[in-house]
Amino acid sequence: VSLLPRDLDRFVREIWDELKTEFGFDSVFLTPFPHITYCIVEERKTKIDPLIEAIASNTPPLIARTEYLGVFSGEKPVIFIGLARNSRLASLHHALWTELCDSVDNRAIAYNEIHWIPHITVVFGDDLNRSNIGPVMERLAFKDFHHELTIDNLTILEEVPGEGIVIREKLRLAGPLEDY
């Protein structure tokens, strides 16, 4: 994942807090760090840290933009802030997917290169249902979701029994800027 810069992190947390106050939503707090997910590795069958370190050291920080409010539909819909997919963001995802996600037992097919939609989760899980999705979208639809951000890190999140999701390691993107 990439954690968000401070201003966008604060914007997303304010939305999370507003939805918790108004609708009682708390599922998003299971991973209490606003972030962009590139892939999910559920089992550590290989040593992934050196792969992530190599990608981080060879990738320069990149500029991205949030552009819209979206919904992944289905039995358990997800409301998200969508990012415009640009070539640098797609290249970072490609590097992570091919070097990391293809090398492990990855059950999160939604993150493969064909299906991946870069996004920041706003609401998911059992919080959303047919009776509240309309009022939630009505509340969110009039907010400005256009933000420019610098993606400057790759962060490894890990589920620790008794603690929940924690930051295991945060790596700075440190590749040469002149190549881009």
Label for each model-derived stretch:
Residues 1-65, 86-145, 163-180:
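Basic, often amphipathic N-terminal segments
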Residues 68-76, 111-116, 152-163:
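Short proline/glycine- and acidic-rich turn/helix-capping motifs at secondary-structure junctions
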Residues 43, 71-74, 151, 173-175:
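Generic structural "secondary-structure junction" signal
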